């Protein structure tokens, strides 16, 4: 019987968890760290804030958020892969980050009350969920009025020539890197599939607005290989 997208994605991340961080650096040529750093600068996270990192994986962005909110803040990281969370927990414990709590859960149905967080992030995870809009609506639901919802994700380059090279890289080269460095050709073939079908920047910005967010900002990175989308939940009337 054919697996659902959710089942397939779960299997992928359970299998690649121990090599995920290394492969992120290989695949993005280390650029993902700079993209996240610039996104954090734009977010302007305030000390003492409360944040949720959805599809947190091995907790890199969760940890960055913890540094920004400080000891008086609180950061929750949520992921449905227990193996990815196990890697993240090792990092959090090594850094003795008492303000971080990692949770096994589903992005499609966040286990939090409405209007709970100042910031809700998702990094390189939205393309892997079964329903993009459902997750965006859930993120919007749990952020406070005036709070920010942020997505950092692969995108669709528009520059002629570069786009063709990007497609070839993701379709053929990235799975080979997966086989070479992580012994996971099949799993990294899935990652290129999910990236190739993900909405472009303009479409995702419209989805942010449809989810109920305002003042949507879009920041492309590296000729549009990745992009940040940031939206603000309107204040209650």
From Swiss-Prot:
The keyword Cell division does not apply. Its EC number is 2.1.1.163. It catalyses: a 2-demethylmenaquinol + S-adenosyl-L-methionine = a menaquinol + S-adenosyl-L-homocysteine + H(+). One of its GO terms (molecular function) is demethylmenaquinone methyltransferase activity. Pfam families: Ubie_methyltran. One of its GO terms (biological process) is menaquinone biosynthetic process. Belongs to the class I-like SAM-binding methyltransferase superfamily. MenG/UbiE family. This is Demethylmenaquinone methyltransferase.
